[in-house]
Amino acid sequence: MLALVGLCLSSCQDPAKSRLYMDEGVKLMLNYSKFKEAEEALDKAVKYDKNNYDAYYHRGCLRVNMKKYREALADFEQAIELKPDFADAYFNMGRTYVLLNDEDRACEYYKLAAQYGRPNLDDYLRRCN
């Protein structure tokens, strides 16, 4: 029985399908502002490839736009777990903490974004002591 469950979990992963759903979700978000539909597509992207750090990242960005800040943070954290040098994910963690009125945590993530090569952070880092 456990072997069947393991087989299903591995066979249910489909990186190509994940990429298609991710691209669709990003298009719906950026071109049409269809946030609910975009979230559904990005949910499927994550379902089909649990290692697709870009899908978690884009879903995090979408959820910030939807004011689902805690869920966005979880997505950015997952993206960072999968790709520890993901500078844009650190930057967006910082932006999200600003929206949650937590400047100290925001500064931590802005500094990490800078450490991993995110350009144009001077204005953000000036707020940090």
Regions from the PLM with identified roles:
Residues 17-19, 53-54, 87-88, 120-122:
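Helix-start (N-cap) detector for alpha-helical repeat units in TPR-like alpha-solenoids
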Residues 29-30, 57, 63-64, 98:
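Position-specific recognition of the canonical hydrophobic site in helix A of tetratricopeptide repeat
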Residues 43-47, 77-81, 112-115:
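Conserved structural position within tetratricopeptide repeats
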Residues 58, 92, 124-126:
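Canonical tetratricopeptide repeat
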Residues 104-129:
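Terminal, low-structured helical/coil segments at or just beyond the last alpha-helical repeat
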